[in-house]
Amino acid sequence: MNFLLSWIHWGLAALLYFHNAKVLQAAPAQGDGDRQQGEVISFLTVYERSACRPVETMVDIFQEYPDEVEYIFKPSCVALMRCGGCCNDEALECVPTEVYNVTMEIMKLKPFQSQHIHPMSFQQHSKCECRPKKEVRIRQENHCEPCSERRKHLYKQDPLTCKCSCKFTDSRCKSKQLELNERTCRCEKPRR
């Protein structure tokens, strides 16, 4: 069902795209410099800009080189092309499928000791795609057997370990003047 809805969704988007192709050719490729304040941006433009694709992103150098804490970098961040945007499905994430390295000259300062311009390598993303999120892949790979054929509603299951445990807690049972039977996962009358 989700597959069919996805195809319909993309079909409508393609139809809108081709229908408004002339409008897009006239629109600026990046930025809103030519737009008037208060002007409404068309759905197709908004949709296209939100798609999963490489976008210029400011990246903190310490994020890329976390072990070089003894230095101060100038500039402290660099503009890199990185995957960004929406995948229109919460089970998917925008990830790079093609990358390359770029070398930039960065000033490395060691307080009260030295400073020099040093070539540093950074990864840029050239192609991006929507792919299943890691936790979704793990859950799909580790498909668990059900806890119990009978009385499934009484159990909860950890999707990572497949361990089954009682859905009800002892405190919940006690609030009803009952006791939790851990073998059956039911709240029962206390034995006397």
Swiss-Prot record:
Record-stated family: Belongs to the PDGF/VEGF growth factor family.
Organism of provenance: Vipera ammodytes ammodytes (Western sand viper)
Matches recorded under PROSITE patterns: PDGF_1, PDGF_2
Tissue specificity note: Expressed by the venom gland, and probably other tissues.
GO cellular component entries: extracellular space; membrane
Cysteine disulfide links: 52-94, 83-128, 87-130
Glycosylation sites: 101
One GO term (biological process): induction of positive chemotaxis
One Pfam family here: PDGF
Alphabetically ordered keywords of this record: Angiogenesis, Developmental protein, Differentiation, Disulfide bond, Glycoprotein, Growth factor, Heparin-binding, Mitogen, Secreted, Signal
Predominant localisation class: secreted
Top-rank taxon, per record: Eukaryota
Subunit text: Homodimer; disulfide-linked. Also found as heterodimer with PGF Interacts with FLT1/VEGFR1 and KDR/VEGFR2 receptors, heparan sulfate and heparin.
Function: Growth factor active in angiogenesis, vasculogenesis and endothelial cell growth. Induces endothelial cell proliferation, promotes cell migration, inhibits apoptosis and induces permeabilization of blood vessels.
Any one GO molecular function term: vascular endothelial growth factor receptor binding
Secretion signal span: 1-26
Protein name as catalogued: Vascular endothelial growth factor A
Compartments, as annotated in UniProt: Secreted
